[in-house]
Every structure is written in C-alpha cells, then in structure tokens.
From Swiss-Prot:
It is found in: Cytoplasm. It comes from Synechococcus sp. (strain RCC307). Its main location: cytoplasm. GO terms for cellular component: cytoplasm. Gene3D superfamilies: Urease, gamma-like subunit. Belongs to the urease gamma subunit family. The lineage of its organism: Bacteria, Bacillati, Cyanobacteriota, Cyanophyceae, Synechococcales. Its EC number is 3.5.1.5. Keywords: Cytoplasm, Hydrolase. This is Urease subunit gamma.
Length: 100
C-alpha cells in the first residue's frame, strides 16, 4: 500500500481519534491531542457522509463538552481546522470554540 504524506497524516488522526472514542466510552476525560483528533475525525466522517461545511461548523460545538475533557483543554482548543474531502472537492473546515 502506497500512501501520500497527507494520507498518512489523516491515518494518524484516525488512529488517535479511535483511541479517544474508546477512552470516552470508558468514562475517561480526553487530553488536548485526543480531543483535537476526536473533533478532526468527526469532520472527516461528516464530509464523507455528505454533510456541508456550514452544517459541520454549526454542529461541531456539540460533539464534545467540558465535562468530557481534562481541566483546561476546552480553553486550549479554541479552534480546530481540518481539510476534508467532500463530494464536490476538498475544503477546509474550521470549528471555533468547539468544546463548550
């Protein structure tokens, strides 16, 4: 299997996000890298499902709450940006203050 550097980066994000999902299921609070990976995967999967950029930006603040992350993580994650492939091309999705 031959992967481009961008594909390798996305695969790393997916791996970290799956670990974060498992930790959430066990009731553990996410740290900064886990929270960012989790949110990034939601963007990637939403784009793959055909959700629009505007819809992802609107719903993005509902994916994680303050009680699901370690103290201070919500303040550290002021913005998450992910380049995702939509049915009509690749677009940059930005979530502002995604953990509320």
């Amino acid at each position: 299997m031959h992967l481009s550097p961008q594909e390798k980066d996305k695969l790393l994000v997916v791996t970290a996000a799956l670990l974060a999902e498992r930790r959430l299921q066990r009731g553990l609070k996410l740290n900064h890298p886990e929270a960012v990976a989790f949110l990034s995967l939601q963007i990637l999967e939403g784009a793959r499902d055909g959700t629009t950029v505007a819809e992802l930006m609107q719903v993005g603040s509902t994916w994680l709450s303050r009680h699901q992350v370690m103290d201070g993580v919500a303040e550290l994650v002021s913005e998450v940006q992910m380049e995702a492939t939509f049915p009509d091309g690749t677009k940059l999705v930005t979530l502002h203050q995604p953990i509320r």
